[in-house]
Amino acid sequence: MDAENGEGQVQVHLKTKQEHYAVPDVPYAIDGTMTTVELNTFLNALLRNKSGDESAIDFDFLVFDEYLRGRLCDHLKEKAISFEDAIEIEYVERFPAPQPQDCLLHDDWVSAVKVSGKWILTGCYDNTLNIWTHKGKHILTIPGHTAPIKAVDWISLDNDIGRFVSSSQDQTVMLWQWNVDSNAVECVSICKGHERGVDSISVSPDATRFATGSWDTMLKVWSAAEDDAGGDAASSKRPKENGVRTPIMTLQGHRESISAVQWIDTSTLLTTSWDHTMKIWDLSLEGIKTEISTNKSIFDASYSNLNRLIVTASADKNLRLYDPRTNQGSIVRNTYLGHNAWVQTVMWSTTEEFLFVSGAYDNQNKLWDCRSPKAPLYDLLGHGEKVLDIDWSNPKYICSGGADNTVRVFKSRKAGVETMDDK
């Protein structure tokens, strides 16, 4: 018999880190043509024999650090693994499919979405901000910008006061304070310093500063303190308008528009650009720590504090996984194929080490496991036009904004402990 052609059997050991699903650690002879479907049937039969529980569990199977997405024999051949050896297969309970929960209708394209607790903050091409509940109730429309809003982020939020920032094509960033009880909002500072539209914004982990990236190619850092006007050496020499905030730091290095910015820690920033590069900045040195060059414009990136990896979205329809700590060989760990147009937005889960979401100009969101490069776990459908932004800040909700003037809310059925903010 020829196991390599799918004829015959392969010796496997079935392992799991989820002890309540463990089966006896003995070699099992299985057909080389088995797929995830047949392996699930086989494994559930073993579990029924062990526990007597008739309920079926859906599992995914890791073979040499990658999810099985076809026949076992084909997977082993692709990785040049000998069929004579016993193969270790790790199985994990499949992450459940997020369910569509709501559609929040706006008056124009929704280009920015950020969730904190039960509140959804959105920014639109009609120059307005909006606040919604996670249950779809519209709370507030906030005018102020004079051009489309491109990015938003929360600074802080408690039962009484919410503070957040928004950036716009009008070249400004606005810092807002919202009284939750009275539902009154005011712009407490207008941040001026960029010379073109401000496409990206990110608040530091300690909520004391925020960073912005612009079409003027500049990265700027600002104070997020309630009463701090900021000001770097150059701008502090100019007289300040009342309520106007100036940057405390300006960093130059990109050659084209900065498309994304994210804090890695309180002294390190990640940026991506249309100039095909990704840069990691050391703010204590006020300079570039690492530069990664690619062959396409990068539209978005997300750094995970759980696995310390970066996933990027780019113009060639692909997502890529980078390890910025690698000094030798390729730092591209994987390429993820599945979208059919520009990938505009990407974000890691804040609680699930291997999961991230993406949104693209093919009108689709996708939920990925970084160990499954050949296919996403799920397609999250609903948008009728291109997806412009996606957010998974709250583990319970995946929210995306699009050119169909909607925010789509998907509920995750695996979200940990419920908090009072989510009720």
Curated annotation (Swiss-Prot):
GO terms for biological process: maturation of 5.8S rRNA from tricistronic rRNA transcript (SSU-rRNA, 5.8S rRNA, LSU-rRNA); maturation of LSU-rRNA from tricistronic rRNA transcript (SSU-rRNA, 5.8S rRNA, LSU-rRNA). InterPro entries: G-protein_beta_WD-40_rep (IPR020472), NLE (IPR012972), WD40/YVTN_repeat-like_dom_sf (IPR015943), WD40_repeat_CS (IPR019775), WD40_repeat_dom_sf (IPR036322), WD40_rpt (IPR001680), WDR12/Ytm1 (IPR028599). GO terms for molecular function: ribonucleoprotein complex binding. PROSITE patterns: WD_REPEATS_1, WD_REPEATS_2, WD_REPEATS_REGION. GO terms for cellular component: nucleoplasm; PeBoW complex; preribosome, large subunit precursor. Residues 10-93 are annotated as: Ubiquitin-like (UBL) domain. SUPFAM superfamilies: WD40 repeat-like. It is found in: Nucleus, Nucleolus; Nucleus, Nucleoplasm. Keywords: Nucleus, Repeat, Ribosome biogenesis, rRNA processing, WD repeat. The keyword rRNA processing applies. It holds the Pfam family NLE. WD repeats lie at residues 105-142, 144-186, 193-232, 253-291, 293-332, 338-378, 382-420. Belongs to the WD repeat WDR12/YTM1 family. Required for maturation of ribosomal RNAs and formation of the large ribosomal subunit. This is Ribosome biogenesis protein WDR12 homolog. It comes from Drosophila willistoni.
